[in-house]
Amino acid sequence: MRFKNVLVLLLLLVFSVINSEPSAPATISDNIYTTLYSSYPCTKIMTSDGQFGCSSKHGGNSGILYLIDDDESYNNYFSYSQQKDIIVVLDTNYFNSTSVLNLHNKSKIEGIIVLTDTKKTYPYSPDSRYPNKIYGLYPNSNLEWNPNADGFTYFSFPFPIFAIDNQTSVAIRNVSKHNRDGQYPAWGAELDSFMQGAINSETCLRRGFCEPVGGQSIWSSFSSKIDKEKEIILVMLPFDTTAFFRDLSIGADQSSFATVTLLSVIKSLAAVDRSSWNKEVVFAFWNAERWGYVGSEYFINDLLNFQCKTYNSDKSKCIDPPRADLAFQTQINFTKISTIIELNQIGRAQLDKNLGKYSLYLHTAGTKTSSVTDILDQVASSYENSTITFKPTTQTELPPSSSMSFLKKTNKIPVVVITDHDYKYSNPYYGYEQDDNENVLGSTLNDIVYILSTFIDRIAGGNNNITIDKNFINILYPCFTSSITCFNILMKTYPLNEVPNFYSSVFGTSLTTTLSPYETKLIHRLLYSITQYNSTLTNCTSDNDCPSSLCYSGQCVSSNTHLHNALSLGFDFDTSKNVWKIVNSSYPIFTESNWDYTALKVFKIGNSTTEIWFLVSGLIELLVSIGLILYVKKFLSNRYKLL
């Protein structure tokens, strides 16, 4: 009986020890922290002479939540006596350079969470007042195209800044108010977005902690092969966007509206008889244009200067220097480009109350532009019940645009840049997260598509009756400005983030290993599908089954659609050291820092009395446990001689 009692006691001790141990470290972490998955960090960008953006400390920054949602809470912050580290929660109206720099300079903060459950009540852009000024045609210009800008994007902060989605913002606002009311337990947050890059682009690249900002541009033609002897009409746009939080770069007016427009124009023209066209029409979507027009610059440089030293067996690719596609060299003659039409910001056409129509503006450069704009005016005026009219700009300089890259090489090409502004941007949120579907006029889209489709058909030599594909437009428009969950037939994968994001990202780990975001791949496949000239009877399940073509609806399809590197000419890849290097710092030198992962977690914080009570109770429990163990040990030793 005694032995049985001893055995039971030992089993109870073992059982208590086992149950006192955590099953896994993650269990404790999960019980303490709540991870917020819909969070979007500010990242760090390196330049040739410094850096801008944000980063947390290694392991993250944490602190108690402090809500600033009105002037009183903003002013009270500077007399806030809380001794603990602070994570500031900002209503979107207080997210600007003046407020944040004031907080940063006058107090120590561990990080910032920006709420998105409300809209800014004033126009705001964190970009510069003349985007890309030093890389354009007029580096000494005194114009300010973007008057609502404060340059906030280009400041550097030693703490993390996160935005969170609408639903999460409501929850964080509530628990932050809980803190402000002095209730316990209080709430804190941990922001982890450690960026490995430091100093500048040269140092960061040498250490292998950065990659060049860039991507891949896309160009396409209806012709199976462009006749190099024919004149070329180049219809183009910059399709990448920017925002303070890169994962929220919708850029509805900045680019997305124009991208939808041009894709819809191409869709309309795909259905017409093009046999009467006496000119080639090339459609181009330039990437990484917001970083010094590097997409268009790289393409032009390849057209004019590229020389392949070593080809592959069929001369379709170049091994040295590496180019995966040489169609640009075999099909496009730079001197044959006779007209450039660029769609820029066109999503906020201005209402002319006298005409009862919305106005878009024509910015021209080069020679003989009137012959082009006259045709556009004729098309627009002949379209009955049109809501759109076109006006000449009052400015002598072009707005920031990809056309500048071409005009640097020659001023003999007629260039027409179409925008929704005469001078100052009509876009109140350029480069900001609120440049979304609510910031553009979707009601003008059909008329713009019809007029531009007819216009391009006319200048190419056609005289077709245009019918726009409204169903295509109705699918594409919300997809590119609201939720990019469309066209699942074209894309086998699903976007990780449903918010459309046209940030160009980084180019890749080498010249032959490029990275293409979901949105770039989608535009490429859309273009490929629309401009296809041949569908074989070859069955396929993936692109791997289709050499030199792509797989659509179970069949291999051919198209004259191509990807082209969008990378600053200031970079080259050192194959001997397997690192990027800077070869010419006069070009844009933007690199993005590497990071392991990003996370935003919230947790509860007790008051000092509660914390002391937990400490004391823990010590009491420890002492009681030690006393119990010593007693049991002595009891077993004396009575049963077991210990």
Curated annotation (Swiss-Prot):
The keyword Amino-acid biosynthesis does not apply. It holds the Pfam family Nicastrin. Disulfide bonds join 42-54, 204-210, 308-318, 479-486, 540-551, 546-556. Residues 1-20 form the signal peptide. Keywords: Disulfide bond, Glycoprotein, Membrane, Notch signaling pathway, Signal, Transmembrane, Transmembrane helix. It is found in: Membrane. Residues 633-643 are cytoplasmic. GO terms for biological process: autophagy; macropinocytosis; Notch signaling pathway; phagocytosis; protein processing; sorocarp spore cell differentiation. The chain crosses the membrane at residues 612-632. GO terms for cellular component: endoplasmic reticulum; gamma-secretase complex; plasma membrane. It is a single-pass type I membrane protein. Glycans are attached at residues 96, 166, 333, 385, 584. Its main location: membrane. InterPro entries: Ncstrn_small (IPR041084), Nicastrin (IPR008710). The keyword Disulfide bond applies. Residues 21-611 are extracellular. Essential subunit of the gamma-secretase complex, an endoprotease complex that catalyzes the intramembrane cleavage of integral membrane proteins such as Notch receptors and APP (amyloid-beta precursor protein). Belongs to the nicastrin family. Component of the gamma-secretase complex, a complex composed of a presenilin homodimer, nicastrin, aph1 and pen2. This is Nicastrin.
